[in-house]
Structure formats: C-alpha cells, structure tokens
C-alpha cells in the first residue's frame, strides 16, 4: 500500500474501460452494406453452421454481424442495420443484424418473441 507522499507524487490512475462495440461510435445502431454473406462454425464444444455477414458501415468500419433466426434473405449489397451484442461461440462476431429493418426481412411463422425477429403479428 503506497504512502501519502507516494500518492502525492504519482496519483492513482483510473482504470480505462474498454469499448466492446467500437464500430458503433456511441450510437445505438448503424447502417451498413453486406460485402459477404456466409456461414461459419462455432467454437468447441458447440457444432452448427452459423449465418454471418461481413458489413461495411457508413463510417467506414468493416465488421462481422450475426444473422439471428431461421432463414434469411440477405445477399451481397443488401443494406442492413446492426446493433451491438456479441455471439459467445463465434470469435470476432460482436454485432447483430436487426431483422425486419431495411433490406432484412423478419422471420417467417414466428409466434413468440416476434419483436426480436421483426415478425408481424399473425392474424
């Protein structure tokens, strides 16, 4: 533990908080264009083909975004909206694509948690 004199000479430094979503630049969402839509495999012990897209944002950042839900209509040059939120078993995927906004369609036949997947209320 430092003495009072040591603290006067060199005060305590505040810990720097690392930003988990730097590409958003403090914004809640950002718009971008898909440059590549592909599938990737998760880390051990999980096994699947997760749908992801490489996205060039309006601020020039190039990020990887996860496409949630079953089935999607995204392809190259699709305009999408992303939000923060990583996918724990996909290294490097720190953003989610928002379903039902811009060129991304909502999930079909979705009955529960519809707002998370951009699905309209069934009649």
Swiss-Prot record:
Modified residues (3-methylthioaspartic acid): 89
Gene Ontology molecular function: rRNA binding; structural constituent of ribosome; tRNA binding
PROSITE patterns the record matches: RIBOSOMAL_S12 (PS00055)
GO process terms (BP): translation
A Pfam family assignment: Ribosom_S12_S23
Disulfide bonds listed in the record: none
Listed InterPro entries: NA-bd_OB-fold, Ribosomal_uS12, Ribosomal_uS12_bac
Highest taxon above the source species: Bacteria
Cell membrane among keywords: no
Keywords assigned: Methylation, Ribonucleoprotein, Ribosomal protein, RNA-binding, rRNA-binding, tRNA-binding
GO cellular component: small ribosomal subunit
Keyword tRNA-binding: yes
Purpose of the protein: With S4 and S5 plays an important role in translational accuracy. Interacts with and stabilizes bases of the 16S rRNA that are involved in tRNA selection in the A site and with the mRNA backbone. Located at the interface of the 30S and 50S subunits, it traverses the body of the 30S subunit contacting proteins on the other side and probably holding the rRNA structure together. The combined cluster of proteins S8, S12 and S17 appears to hold together the shoulder and platform of the 30S subunit.
Family named by the database record: Belongs to the universal ribosomal protein uS12 family.
Subunit structure: Part of the 30S ribosomal subunit. Contacts proteins S8 and S17. May interact with IF1 in the 30S initiation complex.
Protein name per UniProt: Small ribosomal subunit protein uS12
Organism expressing this protein natively: Agrobacterium fabrum (strain C58 / ATCC 33970)
Lineage start: Bacteria, Pseudomonadati, Pseudomonadota, Alphaproteobacteria, Hyphomicrobiales
Gene designation per UniProt: rpsL
């Amino acid at each position: 533990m430092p003495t009072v004199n040591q603290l006067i000479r060199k005060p305590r430094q505040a810990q720097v908080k690392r930003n988990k979503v730097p590409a958003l630049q403090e914004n809640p969402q950002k718009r971008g264009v898909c440059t590549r839509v592909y599938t990737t495999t998760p880390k051990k012990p999980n096994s699947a083909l997760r749908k992801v897209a490489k996205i060039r944002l309006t601020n020039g950042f190039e990020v990887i975004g996860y496409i949630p839900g079953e089935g999607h209509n995204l392809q190259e040059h699709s305009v999408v909206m992303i939000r923060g939120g990583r996918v724990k078993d996909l290294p490097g995927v720190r953003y989610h694509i928002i379903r039902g906004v811009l060129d991304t369609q909502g999930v079909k036949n979705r009955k529960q948690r519809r707002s998370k997947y951009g699905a309209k209320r069934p009649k």
